[in-house]
Regions:
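N-terminal basic, amphipathic alpha-helical segments
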Residues: 1-6, 198
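Conserved core of the PLP fold type I
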Residues: 5, 10-150, 155, 161-174, ...
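Active-site PLP attachment segment
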Residues: 172-203
Length: 203
């Protein structure tokens, strides 16, 4: 082991690793994340990826960048506490969407679009927090269709998606130009690894 560490130290390019990192992440890092996201069913490129210090940081950045004080976002009746904190801090109102079979219903989403003036939708399709429900493929397609019709910004929190043994396409794969897709290493590798990536629409 001692010899191995000595070899590693000799191979390290200290001049490179002790420099400031690139603001939007190193290209090799983003290419690796793009491959990881592809395994979850979403084709993206390194140019479409932005780094964040964990999933919560990604959510705050998205809300602050794409929404304004007073905007409304649809959520599950029971949703991730972190988005409640972020929305409250930014003056964004969260609107619970009626469910059917433990996931957002078509009726509920249509009602919110027509009557609640929602600008966006926050979802956790795989192992939803706190219910752990996995959204059906039909449910994902339905959300994409309605979001497209009403021009909603969909925030797809996919931090658990790679843990799903049954492959289900993400909403972003059906609605790539209106979906902000979040993936994080904190849940699938280690909590102390505070690294998330946001896959953004090309346009």
């Amino acid at each position: 082991m001692n010899n191995l560490f000595k070899h590693i130290i000799k191979e390290i390019d200290f001049k490179t690793i002790f420099q400031y990192g690139q603001r939007d992440g190193a290209k090799w890092q983003k290419e690796a994340i793009a491959k990881l996201i592809y395994k979850a069913g979403l084709e993206t490129t390194s140019d479409s990826l932005l780094p964040a210090s964990g999933g919560q940081n990604a959510i705050v950045a998205i809300l602050a960048g794409l929404f304004q004080h007073g905007d409304r976002i649809g959520v599950d009746p029971l949703t991730y506490p972190g988005i409640k904190t972020a929305a409250k801090m930014l003056g964004i109102q969260l609107i619970p969407i009626k469910q059917e079979d433990n996931e957002i219903s078509e009726e509920g989403l249509l009602y919110a679009c027509k009557n609640e003036n929602i600008k966006g939708l926050y979802i956790i399709p795989d192992y939803q927090n706190p219910t752990t429900h996995i959204m059906s493929q039909n449910g994902r397609k339905m959300i994409a269709n309605i979001a497209s019709k009403y021009n909603l910004i969909v925030i797809e929190d996919a931090i658990h998606s790679l843990l799903n043994e049954t492959h289900l396409n993400p909403v972003a794969s059906y609605l790539p130009n209106q979906t902000i897709y979040i993936t994080s290493l904190s849940k699938i590798i280690a909590p102390s690894l505070r690294l998330a990536y946001i896959s953004t629409p090309k346009q």
